[in-house]
Amino acid sequence: MKQFNIALCALLTACVALPALAKDTPTGTITTATGSASGAIRWKNSAKEYVLTNSKNMTVTYKADEVENVSIDRPASLDAAIKKVQTNNGLAAAIATLEELAKDYNHLTYDQEATGWLAKGYLLQGNAAKAIAACEAVIRDNPEAAYKGATAVSYWEALIKDGKSAKLNILLDKAISSGDKTAAANALVKRGDAAMARGSARANCEEALRDGYLRVILLYADPTSDAYAEALYKGAKAFEGMSQSSQANRLREQLKQECPASSWARAK
């Protein structure tokens, strides 16, 4: 018994001694006209400045207007959290991680990507209001994020779910006229989605094809673009809703031939 107690105490001591898992700390390199420096980086929104702490624990402050470039290292926990949202497996843990990343990486490159996936996680939980709030926290600091970049698509999806069509249409128009091909293609897909969200009536299917999916297929035909593959898949679904199976099959075949590696080519 004495030996058992000694072993148990040793085990407990070892457990107590284990270090807590450290969360991601933003690190990277700040470049100015006079040189560059690397270390832990945070953004102070109130002062519009970056604070860098180097390996010698020295802190340097850079005003935003004197910084030429900020290169941030990708957070180690981001990809695993994204995978959990994509598979809807371990969603609560993924959301907790993404909430932290969105906060800690504020104005540091990966806040938009983390927020986009965080919003998708909230939507999987059926909480469009939370998804909108998460996106708008980023948009307040960077208004362009409402119609371009990694947050925008998730924001539009949340607006569709929440029935906020007036705000959605303004943002889709901005994205389409922005000159950014990726933003424009994504916006046209969401314009189609907004029509289909009203139901599978023939008129909605026609609108989704005319104003959304077919425009992407004709104007933004790029097999490497996720929006193009998505438009082919959803265009086929819309034709199917109109009982035009030959057109639906043509788009499905086009999707498999041109975008075989896309997840949309494997979707049912």
Regions found by a protein language model. Give the residues of each.
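Bacterial N-terminal signal peptides that target proteins for export
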Residues: 1-8
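Short solvent-exposed coil/turn linkers within tandem alpha-helical repeat scaffolds
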Residues: 55-62, 102-111, 140-150, 174-187, ...
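N-terminal signal peptide c-region/cleavage motif recognized by signal peptidases
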Residues: 17-19
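Flexible, glycine-rich surface segments
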Residues: 166-215, 225
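Compositionally biased alpha-helical segments
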Residues: 21-141, 153, 157, 161, ...
